[in-house]
Each structure stands twice: as C-alpha cells, then as structure tokens.
C-alpha cells in the first residue's frame, strides 16, 4: 500500500481552522482503504495554546485504519524532525496543505527535497485566491515574493480543486512543474430529507463561518437592514470571532435592526455537529467574498436545505437548479431574495429542499472523484 505523508497546521480532533481540516479529514475518510496516511500536525487547536488532552504528543497515534497522526508540540517543530519523520515513514508522496505556514508548508518542502522524496504535492486550499490574499495582504505578498526568489516551489506538483484555483496559483507562483485538478471530497454520510415547517413570511437562517472580512459577515448583516418589515428573520451565527474590531462593526449593525430581525451569535461548534444543526433552519446564508470549495454549502445541501450565497464560490446556477441562489455582492439583491424565500409557500419550499438534496447525492456518490485521486497519487501522468 502506497504511503502518503501529510503536513497540515491543524487536524482532527481540531475543527476551528475550518475548511482545510475538513478537506483533509474527508480525503482520508474516502481513501484510507487504498493508501496509508501519516499526518503531521500541531498538538493544539487553532488559536489555542493548550495541547489536546486525548492524544499523545510527539509520537505516532493510531487514528483510523491505515491512518496515523503525529501531534507535535511548539518546541519540537524543526527541519531535523521533519527529515527524521520522512526517513522513518519512507513515503511515496509528501502532501502539504496550505501556503503561508513556515513550519507546515515551507520546512516540509525543504525536508522532502533534502531526503529526495520523488513526489511532493502542495494543495493551496484556497489561500492563493484574491479574497484570501487581500486579508493581511502586505505580509502575504512579501511571503510569496520570497518563495519565488528562493524557488521554493520548483519541481513541485500542485493539487488544485478547480480551474479557478489553478489560475490563482499560476498568477501568484508563476510557471508550474505539474498540476492535478481534483475536487474536494464531501463528508461521508447517509442522506435523507427531513422536512421543516415553512410559515408564511418567517425565516430561520444560519451561517457557519469565521466572523471575519473574507466571510463577509458584516455584509450579510447589512443586507438584513434592507429586508421588508413584513418579514420576520432569525439569523444564527456559528463560528469563531476572528477580529474583535470587525465583530464590533457587526454589533453596531445589529443594534440598528427593527423588531422583525433577530440575530444570535451562537459561537464555535464542532464541525461534526454541523449537519445535524442545519436542518433546523430554512436556509444557509453565507455571502462570502470567495470559497475554494465551501464545505458548509455542500453540507447544507446534504441536510436538504437551500442556500443563499455569493457568486464567488464553485456552487453556481443554483436558481436555475431550484436549490438556492448564488448572487452578486449587492446588499439589496440578498434582501430581495430573503423576502422571496420568506414568501414562498410550503410546497415550493419543499421542492427547493429536494433539489438541494439531489445536488448532495450527486456529490456524495461520485465514483469518478475517487478514481481521480487514486490516479493522482499512483500515476505520474499529468492531466
């Protein structure tokens, strides 16, 4: 069985780092019958300093069949350790998640090259999108300039999830040695339609995302200011407050609402709990500035719930598919759509839910995607 050595800043049981953790967890869940995974990660949750209590640090932990995880402490991360792990595992592939981490992106590339690993993959995980680079842009642009100057990414294979991400990589990195395009895996799950009552002119909306500029939380809240007073909206926010100043701006908007709009900040929840929570709402409301994949969008479909999202994600033409809306970032467009959904009768709303579930079924039962990954890790052919 071929061995894949993975480097990622945060991994399960952590969940607060969002999409990259979910992407890697789903990949392992779908492929661990075909490959042995060795995952190197931090022994702490995102933005926390206390180590996990249910893992053993600085040694391999049995995580799942054919999956081992090495949770390393802050004082242990080094080029020397990474080289030692590479020598002990003898991987066929080194697979690196992310771009801007010195310890879990740059050092692993250096270690793998020094140990003459034949195949090194980098998955940017959306970090080279314009919306992502725009956050703390000066630091990121300097970082990328240094990687180009030092030719860090020479002779690296890239894993992008779609053509748009491929264009982002070429625009920021330059000429690439090799690229594979393979979409993210969904969470493994049994899908079913659990209906929800749809009272006239009343909506329960939810968002599962960091409270941060790139997720456009402030825009979402400002959009609600334009919703008609005839519509009653309850909007629950799940996610980490990433920036206190940004959250204060959000609270300033919330303070302006009339009685028909109610916003609740719920806080951070484990991503494993998301599917069971979404079906208590009528729709996901997430007008983010950009998503490389948007796991929570797919999970809304898996819960048979439509979405109201921006047109800056891979999930497009949703109104045509009668499964939701993907809109340009214009506040009044979102407000009118919320009013439209609120006025929708039960039978029409149920059609939206069923169509959302159909999108999920197509994504979950995608044998071609599994074949694409198998070929990606086994073959040298570039496509």
Give residue spans per PLM region.
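Glycosyltransferase donor-sugar binding loop
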Residues: 42-46, 208, 234-251, 265-267
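Aromatic "clamp/platform" in nucleotide-sugar-dependent glycosyltransferases that forms part
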Residues: 289
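Short hydrophobic beta-strand element within catalytic cores of glycosyltransferases
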Residues: 302, 306-310
């Amino acid at each position: 069985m071929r061995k894949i050595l993975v480097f990622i800043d945060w991994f399960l049981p952590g969940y607060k780092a969002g999409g990259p953790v979910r992407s890697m967890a789903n990949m392992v869940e779908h492929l661990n019958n075909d490959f042995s995974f060795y995952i190197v990660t931090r022994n702490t949750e995102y933005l926390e300093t206390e180590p996990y209590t249910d893992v053993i640090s600085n040694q391999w932990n049995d995580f799942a069949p054919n999956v081992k995880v090495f949770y390393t402490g802050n004082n242990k991360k080094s080029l020397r350790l990474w080289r030692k792990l590479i020598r002990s595992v003898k991987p066929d592939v080194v697979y690196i998640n992310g771009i801007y981490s010195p310890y879990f992106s740059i050092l692993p590339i250096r270690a793998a090259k020094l140990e003459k690993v034949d195949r090194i993959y980098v998955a940017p995980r959306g970090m080279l999108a314009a919306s992502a680079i725009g956050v703390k842009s000066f630091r990121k642009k300097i970082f990328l300039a240094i990687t180009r100057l030092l030719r860090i990414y020479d002779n690296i294979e890239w894993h992008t999830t779609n053509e748009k991400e491929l264009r982002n990589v070429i625009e920021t990195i330059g000429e690439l040695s090799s690229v594979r395009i393979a979409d993210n895996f969904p969470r493994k799950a049994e899908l079913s339609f659990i209906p929800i009552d749809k009272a006239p002119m009343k909506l329960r909306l939810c968002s599962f995302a960091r409270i941060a500029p790139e997720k456009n939380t402030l825009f979402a809240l400002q959009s609600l200011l334009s919703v008609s007073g005839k519509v009653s909206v309850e909007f629950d926010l799940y996610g980490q407050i990433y920036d206190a100043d940004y959250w204060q701006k959000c609270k300033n908007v919330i303070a302006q609402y009339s009685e028909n709009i109610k916003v609740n900040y719920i806080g951070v929840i484990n991503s494993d709990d998301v599917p069971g929570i979404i079906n208590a709402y009528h729709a996901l409301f997430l007008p983010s500035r950009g998503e490389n994949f948007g796991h929570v969008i797919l999970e809304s479909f898996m819960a048979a719930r439509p979405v109201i999202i921006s047109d800056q994600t891979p999930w497009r033409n949703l109104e045509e598919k009668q499964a939701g809306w993907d809109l340009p970032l214009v506040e009044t467009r979102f407000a009118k759509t919320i009013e439209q959904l609120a006025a929708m009768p039960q039978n029409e709303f149920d059609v939206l839910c069923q169509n959302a579930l159909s999108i999920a079924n197509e994504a979950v039962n995608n044998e071609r995607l599994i074949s694409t990954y198998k070929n990606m890790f086994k073959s040298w052919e570039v496509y």
